[in-house]
Amino acid sequence: MTSSAGQRISCNVVETRLNDVARIFNIQRYSLNDGEGIRTVVFFKGCPHLCPWCANPESISGKIQTVRREAKCLHCAKCLRDADECPSGAFERIGRDISLDALEREVMKDDIFFRTSGGGVTLSGGEVLMQAEFATRFLQRLRLWGVSCAIETAGDAPASKLLPLAKLCDEVLFDLKIMDATQARDVVKMNLPRVLENLRLLVSEGVNVIPRLPLIPGFTLSRENMQQALDVLIPLNIRQIHLLPFHQYGEPKYRLLGKTWSMKDVAAPSSADVATMREMAERAGFQVTVGG
């Protein structure tokens, strides 16, 4: 959806699909880590950022991608004519377009779980703000059903896209990816000043914001990064934060996409390192959840 690193600094993206059609890559049911209760999580495809630690590389491109699972391949060569003719299912498409009506029907299959657990629907990504108009219309529909709504976002978009969507949510899981402005700009391709401005705006508008801080060796797993985040959050009277330790669960996805992951040999944070970050936040008065 973007053509150069310079353009990838923000979510100033022209929505390329009709507003009643979205591009997603997964619907995950029975999630317990993306908001209150049992959640159905809709993962939108496309992200303007380039986080080296991304665990969902299939979410980055806004295009529908086709991958081949070598273990399933029969080497019959039928795919040379048409990948859809593959008899073994070795070819897999990542991403699909779905209408408002179809997505509404899909998530409402889980309504009984929402009502019995206090759960609901969470929109994640990729970056949901790249398809903000669709997402806003979709949550408006869910609100008519009385469904609890949440989004997970990095907040790097014009407030005109973020605020109407956030106001439909019971929770906004706000990813504070990195607090160093230079790394945010040059590595992650993120507009950190705007992210922080949007964070403050949401809080001032009464939105229930839950910041999420990734703990990434070499980037954010440091006292300095944590203190910078706390310095931003303390004046906002936010009481709850999530700490998300780095993991290697995404490594097979990079291989499937034919990509080399720069962090494939990076170890997860030690329990002692995570405890240090947690203690800093708790001493500052925050209720801390590790893992979301």
Model-found features: residue ranges?
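Pocket-edge positions in alpha/beta enzyme catalytic cores
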Residues: 65, 95, 127, 187, ...
